[in-house]
């Protein structure tokens, strides 16, 4: 059939006894089982098509017990994870050569956009250091090979979703902060480099 418009929109449905029922607020659903105070957890506002979606990124860094360290990712590109680990090692001095690294996007969602990078990097660093991230902070940003945090698209849409889900702070690229319309009651933490982000939350 002929199709007009974007074809990459996400719909979330729940199977009930009378059939499928749309989930009106999938972000709340994906965060409903989030555990507070645990290291290796970061919340990101991603875009699926034009829809903002809040999801939890979970990381577990453990001592490698079987020789070559493993790099396993569910819901996020494994090669992108390896790239971010290399940036953390080269630019921030973190060491993963003796560690297995496991990454999971909670809720079975697959995240492909670069704006998820910062959440992945912070979740991994949090698990390595065993220091929980602030549960009231959501993050968004692309990480460059030099450790810089690059601007992302539709930042105001993301901030609105972050505020609606009850978060108090949003860590965003500094390049997105100029002239930004911020929802009332939401504190913005602009960062230019990955080192700044790590200093703020780890």
What are the functions of these language-model segments?
Residues 1-202:
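Peripheral, non-AAA+ core regions of ATP-driven protein-machinery
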């Amino acid at each position: 059939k002929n199709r007009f418009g974007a074809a990459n929109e996400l719909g979330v449905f729940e199977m009930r006894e009378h059939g499928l029922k749309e989930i009106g607020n999938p972000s709340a659903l994906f965060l409903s089982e989030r555990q507070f105070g645990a290291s290796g957890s970061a919340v990101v506002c991603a875009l699926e098509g034009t829809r903002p979606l809040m999801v939890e990124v979970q990381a577990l860094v453990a001592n490698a017990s079987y020789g070559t360290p493993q790099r396993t990712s569910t819901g996020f590109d494994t090669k992108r994870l390896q790239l971010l680990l290399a940036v953390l090692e080269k630019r921030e001095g973190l060491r993963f050569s003796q560690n297995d690294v496991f990454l999971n996007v909670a809720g079975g969602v697959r995240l492909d956009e670069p704006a998820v990078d910062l959440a992945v990097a912070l979740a991994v660093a949090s698990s390595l250091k065993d220091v929980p991230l602030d549960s009231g902070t959501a993050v968004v940003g692309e990480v460059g090979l030099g450790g810089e945090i690059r601007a992302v698209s539709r930042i105001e849409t993301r901030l609105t979703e972050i505020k609606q889900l009850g978060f108090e702070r949003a860590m965003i690229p500094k390049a997105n902060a100029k002239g930004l319309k911020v929802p009332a009651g939401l504190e913005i933490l602009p960062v230019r480099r990955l080192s700044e982000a790590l200093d703020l939350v780890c």
